[in-house]
Amino acid sequence: MKTTHRIIACLIALICFSAQRAAADSPLTSTDFHQAYADEPIVAQVEKGRTPSDETWAYLAAPDNPVAVKMAIINKIGWAFEGKNSSQLFLSYLKRKGICKTEKDLYKKRPGDLLLCAAYFKALDNYFNVEDAARMARKAKKNHPDSYTVNII
């Protein structure tokens, strides 16, 4: 009789534990690495979850600024479950400033750090479909194969 009770108890436990869904956060959305860059003035002035200012867009577009700080800015801007349009806003800024004409132009002709910014924004904009973002990030990695930041993002 004890054996039967143990088997039933084990079956009930198995059913209970297997019925729970496993869920995992993505490092894209669950790692607030921008906190490590809190002493950078440009990172400190970005409001988490808010649309960036022109000063922030300019920092992201400037080729001489460190890519790690650029990624920290984007990380702080973050994502929203219902989606965002930061990648389109970034592309619009680049177009307005004459840096690129289209996303295709950005992909083919621009430096890897700009492409990585666009890729990270695109991934955060549509967290459930990162195919384009991954393609852009791979291209950025080809342009900067030795960059730790580019490789880790």
Go through the PLM ranges and name each one.
Residues 66-68, 111-113, 143-151:
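Residue-level recognition of tetratricopeptide repeat
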Residues 121-153:
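Conserved binding-pocket/active-site segment within a compact domain
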Residues 9-18:
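Bacterial N-terminal signal peptides
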Residues 47, 109-113, 127-131:
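Soluble non-cytosolic domains of exported or imported proteins
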Residues 107-122:
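Mid-length scaffold segments of soluble, non-membrane domains
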Residues 77-86, 119-129:
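Short coil/turn linking the two alpha-helices of tandem helical-hairpin repeats
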Residues 23-110:
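N-terminal alpha-helical interaction modules that lie
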Residues 1-9:
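Bacterial N-terminal signal peptides that target proteins for export
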